[in-house]
């Protein structure tokens, strides 16, 4: 933590120092609480919702293949499943390398190679007994998974786990600090970071530090990432007790955790563009669609739709389908939404939402 030193000169100095300390703590605490958060966001116009599939077990992520079907991961079972556009489910593979799953560990992210029709690669993020890692496989092959990035910290909680290819063709990976807070500020550690690697898992050209996969840091448990139509990256971060965050991410940016949660106003940290109370949000998967950012919320049991500057928030589906894990655009222009832990382990849904 940063240390502040104060020179005290007699009684007057003591009074001045006391006043300064009072002002500092007032600003640091009361001013922090006064920072704007997304509260009482209005309900958006009702959306058309269709139940596309049921009987899933804690799904975490979903990615579309070129043929219009999608792959969905189940965190606890380790199953990678394929869903057709009309909702038919087929088991593709069980990722049996995962550690015994916990409430926040297991099979998590999935991404499709941007050159899939040429190379056929599918990428998955999962926790093992020793680490979290990204591996790749081919749909029609029973060959062992090919690890491309290993050594990401893992724990019972705070494992991040979302993976997406960016507009630049590089693979972006969200990692949590695995319940070890100092990791997030250690630039040599892979926990509490956004990582950026080539499709082969090597540090991507142009990263802030040559030879390092670290793109930005200071995150607690980031589970959502998306790009707008100008190529700007946004990341959602799951807060502790105070505030969740929506961040506009730049290479080399430090987003504050554990020094700051929410808006701190410190020059060495990048403040979020929007914050929520965890009871209202607890953000997970997110996307950019129709000019706005969409975020699926776990504790908040809703979708948030918000402008890219953090303004004009609206909420949808509030309390209707339980905890929401992911929202992602489908080829037909709709949004597909994953529920998470809906009244039982095998009761989760895939919803098709047309705003």
What is each PLM-predicted segment?
Residues 311-321:
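C-terminal soluble interaction/assembly domains
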């Amino acid at each position: 933590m940063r240390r502040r030193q104060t020179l005290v000169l007699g009684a007057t100095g003591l009074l001045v120092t006391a006043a300064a300390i009072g002002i500092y703590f007032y600003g640091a605490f009361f001013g922090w609480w006064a920072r704007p958060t997304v509260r009482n966001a209005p309900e958006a116009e009702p959306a058309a919702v269709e139940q596309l599939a049921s009987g899933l077990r804690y799904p975490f992520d979903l990615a579309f293949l070129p043929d219009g079907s999608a792959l969905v991961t189940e965190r606890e079972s380790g199953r990678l499943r394929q869903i057709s556009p009309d909702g038919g489910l087929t088991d593709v593979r069980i990722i049996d390398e995962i550690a015994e799953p916990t409430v926040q560990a297991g099979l998590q992210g999935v991404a499709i190679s941007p050159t899939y029709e040429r190379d056929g690669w599918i990428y998955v993020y999962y926790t093992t007994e020793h680490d979290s890692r990204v591996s790749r496989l081919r749909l029609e092959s029973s060959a062992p998974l090919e690890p491309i990035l290993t050594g990401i910290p893992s724990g019972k909680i705070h494992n991040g786990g979302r993976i997406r290819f960016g507009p630049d063709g590089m693979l972006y990976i969200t990692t949590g600090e695995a319940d070890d807070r100092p990791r997030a500020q250690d630039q040599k550690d892979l926990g509490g970071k956004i990582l950026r690697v080539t499709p082969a898992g090597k540090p991507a050209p142009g990263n802030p530090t040559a030879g390092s996969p670290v793109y930005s840091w200071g995150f607690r448990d980031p589970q959502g990432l998306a790009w707008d139509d100008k190529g700007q990256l946004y990341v959602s971060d799951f807060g502790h007790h105070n505030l969740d965050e929506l961040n506009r991410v730049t290479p080399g940016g430090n987003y504050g955790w554990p020094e700051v949660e929410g808006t701190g106003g410190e020059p060495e940290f990048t403040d979020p563009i929007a914050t929520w109370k965890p009871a209202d949000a607890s953000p997970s998967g997110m996307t950019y669609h129709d000019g706005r950012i969409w975020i699926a919320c776990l504790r908040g049991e809703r979708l948030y739709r918000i402008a890219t500057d953090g303004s004009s928030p609206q909420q949808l589906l509030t309390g209707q389908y339980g905890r929401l894990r992911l929202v992602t655009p489908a080829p037909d222009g709709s949004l597909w939404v994953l529920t998470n832990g809906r009244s039982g382990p095998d009761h989760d849904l895939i919803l098709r939402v047309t705003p």
